Amino acid sequence: MAPYWEVLGCDGVPVPSVESYLQDFWVRGMSSSSVESYARDLLRWFRFLWRSDRDWDRVTRDDVRDFVMSLRETFKRPAEIRRPAGPAVNEVSGKPYLSDVYAPRTINHNLSVISAFYDYHLRALTGPLRNPVPERLTQGGRFGAHHNPEDEYRHGRRADYRQKVPIQAARSIPDKAFEDLFTALGTDRDRALVAFYVSSAARPSELVGLTNRRVDAGQQCISVTRKGSGAVQRIPASPEAFSWFRLYQEALPEELTRSGLSAWWTLRRPYRPLNYEAARAVIRRVNVVLGANWTLHDFRHTAAMRMAQDPKVSITDIQAVLGHVHLSTTEAYLKPRNDEVIESVNRHLSSRASDILAAGGVPASPSRYSAEDMTDLFGGTRWQ
């Protein structure tokens, strides 16, 4: 029976407790990708239990604590390590490389999956009588209990063993960097794909699953199947994207342009519909040329940031295009990028220094050394 993902035990046989949970999880309307994500997290948990010689239905809070400690101290498997030797931040994109250890979000997600797994068996009376994963509580009991939907959630202290997640600004690609990236693309297919990504703000998997029947050049819209709800939604895209798409479609064999077929195909025979991994490979090749570490999701963030910077586009319009359920999720794109903040403050400081010089004054030196000595050493006024 579906959901097509299983967790195998040391004997190569599916783990019954996980199998029944994943089936129940899938029947509740979850996507196959969500089932895969939960299965991988449960596999990580069961591997820890097997190493510790612990039964899954006899674990305690202490076992969960030891599991979190192991994730904080354990390096990822070599196949998962993508960080090259060198600095922690890419010089081209300004983005950090993937860490060699598990991120706080990964640990928290793993705890959420384990908690849901034991909640299921608690209701089914097939597991321990108490969920071993600590729950976040408020003064009134369960977090979010009696919450007024018109008010924002008030986040109290984290549940035990939950990791502190740093607040990060929304990622986006600066205009100059995007021009360099677009120039490095080698085919009309890749240019059309990226142009749709950066103008429609569609999720990578949503655009990869696009069919040519859902491309409406007349209305400048495409229809995508939303990742979460599964609903089909029309979203706008730029005229440049449709122009590149037409050039790409005209170069395809006639049998691949019949209505209802995939909008994207592999470049070599035998032709196959483009999948998510192949789309990621397009960006990986560009990253090798540019020395960057951009991802497909960066295009979605870039589109959102561009719309947020346009005063003619309301935040509710951005929310609708992005497919966000909560407006608070969209508000993250109202914050400026770090490079924009630095540029703006530098302009302010330069303007202030110029105003002081124009008034006949002398800007205060940030150094305790003589201004003449600093000028001789560094030249000009760049050190100021």
What residue ranges belong to the model's regions?
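Conserved tyrosine-mediated DNA breakage-rejoining catalytic core shared by Y-recombinases
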Residues: 200, 205, 209-243
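Catalytic-site neighborhood detector that most strongly recognizes the C-terminal catalytic loop/helix
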Residues: 226, 322-347
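N-terminal core-binding DNA-recognition domain of tyrosine recombinases/integrases
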Residues: 19-33, 43-150
